[in-house]
């Protein structure tokens, strides 16, 4: 889906209710993809080869890495609700798809798991189940303080404290999706230099979705004969939980000797805001543009389609359609 900020789009019409019959608000006259970028997963897909009429073949590497049954994709569900053998409901006489189905002889039963790429939160919630496979008493104590302390109430509804196995299974499926999403190709070493290509196997940008809390980075390590790291690009501090050497970050640890931060190998979005005067901002709700968007586009990415949808690459505050080559 595409998500945009209607409050900013309608800023010049403060106090005008939508649908009042006299004033047509910008959000009523224009598609959501045309103003104030928040998420653009749908636009990324529609600008890819997979979003064109009939879809496209998936990458051989995608299939080889575990998606052997997904050779073609033309809609989001082909990967996120993949076809399996099964029935559509638990009633008697329901045909098993696809073999027993006359209405859908060419497609299986879509698996309704809607797996994405967020493996972390499901795993953390799974760890609150005392009878589950990954119980962690520290996590359980922190998260089970009740709604008076936290907005989270682990004792309401379908509590994760009784569903650890199911939550862990969902986390594992998300990790599988992440493994399918990318392939490192053409890795070569020459004269102390390393070159490689990172291929996007998904039908949207790598990474996609809500950009404020998501990034992907390339980590390169050089080791001596004993296996000791002697040089590292984009080192990650597991204790703090972030990359080292991040500019403008108070929580990012300083780089050590023989360590480098390479921004081009950190694939992410940095919003900008003309309202706050920040070239790069954490005030996501006030974001009016993008300072950085170097996320890897999907196969067949059409800039003529992507640019009006505000999903073209951006580098240092400037729209940069040529950031990736035509071949890339």
State the predicted function of each range.
Residues 2-328:
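Primarily the internal scaffold of c-type cytochrome electron-transfer domains
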